[in-house]
Amino acid sequence: MASKKSMNESFLASMKSTEVCSWFELNVMRRTGFYLAWFANKLDIHPNTITILSMILGAGSTWFFMSGSWYYGYGEQGDKMLGVAFNIIAIGMLFWADVLDNTDGQLARLSGKRSRVGRILDGAAGFVWMIPIYLGLAWRIYQHHSMEFGWFGIDDTPRNALIYGLAVLALTFYSGFVGCGGQQRVGDYYMQVHLLFSKEANGTELDSSEQQQQAYDQLPADAKWWERLFMKNYINYTRTQERTTPKLQKLLAKLKEKYGSVSNMPESLRQQLHDYSLPIIHLDFTGFSYRALSLAFFVLIDFPLGQFLFESIVLGLGTLYTIKRHEAFCEKVTREL
């Protein structure tokens, strides 16, 4: 049996960085993920298997999110307690999906089983959860809307319900693809960039669309169709990250031009970039934490429409602020080089 000290050392070794985590994320989410990763490593389970389990669990919570309601209840009898229970089950499933999403990376670092497909799957996991969950919530809102109609004095007619349902569906697509998708894409990229500036970074990866395109072009003729599909989507994913951050791209290009590689920059410059970046990372408008907490809150109070509004407006404005602040310090440092 490993000692407590050696287990703690292994836990820290399984993390890319500890400074970017909140207390709850580090001591609950990540530590739980580490013990699962340690156990999975003993059983020789591949990190990609954990990622796929995370996808199944997260997407599987959709039915419970769609069916849970304390105000309307569940089924013909309108069982309110069952409606509450479904919401709690859905939140629990999403929590464990997120734990497993952390576990796969920790397992990859513990076992050394890293792959390009694993990185792509890990990036896709959140989308695989949220697309069905958001569509399920849109259906729930369409089915149960009398409370909102009552607030605004709208007659609950089939025509009004259809118009409302279509409007909610449009908001769902915006919130999901522009809000959730766009925000997480920016957050993932800024996290990887920050780790480049961090001395404690462990296994940092910063993929470029150019590198990914080259890897795609070098795929063998008999490569699996799903691998081609994932890689093509990942090329578009990284290309969008780069288009969203033009001043960061200029900074990275300048660092490569001056020092040959970002990793060769002087320690004083690395520390400066790190100190600029860390407060922005801690804002966490683009991360999963605010989104998960708001989702739990709005489904429990039976107002899932609030999730789409919160994500589109509050987190959307927070993300724009994050990008503006990050781009400003990149421009400043580039001028000084």
Predicted regions: what is each one?
Residues 47-117, 130-134, 165-179:
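Membrane-embedded alpha-helical segments that form the functional core of polytopic membrane enzymes
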Residues 58, 62-66, 133, 137-140, ...:
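Structural signal for membrane-spanning alpha-helices in multi-pass inner-membrane proteins
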Residues 138, 154-194, 200:
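Alpha-helical transmembrane segments
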Residues 35, 102, 106, 110, ...:
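Membrane-spanning helices that line or support transport/gating and their immediate boundary helices
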Residues 76-77, 145-160:
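Membrane-interfacial helical/loop segments at transmembrane boundaries in membrane proteins
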Residues 29-43:
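A short amphipathic helical element positioned immediately N-terminal to and/or at the very start
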Residues 47-55, 122-130, 280-289:
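Select subsegments of transmembrane alpha-helices in polytopic membrane proteins
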Residues 1-32, 179, 189-337:
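C-terminal membrane-associated helical module and adjoining short loops/tails
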